Curated annotation (Swiss-Prot):
Species: Opisthacanthus cayaporum
Pfam families referenced in this protein's UniProt entry, alphabetically: Toxin_2
Top-level taxon of the source organism: Eukaryota
Name recorded for this polypeptide: Potassium channel toxin alpha-KTx 6.17
Cysteine pairs bridged by disulfides in the record: 3-24, 9-29, 13-31, 19-34
Length: 34
């Protein structure tokens, strides 16, 4: 999803992928800790 900051990615990553962490890079969420 499009993001402004990394905090917008945490919930998205948890729900969609089960990953526990995420970062906003180039306005796109990248998920980590899968």
């Amino acid at each position: 999803i499009r993001c402004q900051g990394s905090n917008q990615c945490y919930g998205h990553c948890r729900e969609k992928t089960g990953c526990m962490n995420g970062k906003c890079i180039n306005r796109v969420c990248k998920c980590y800790g899968c």
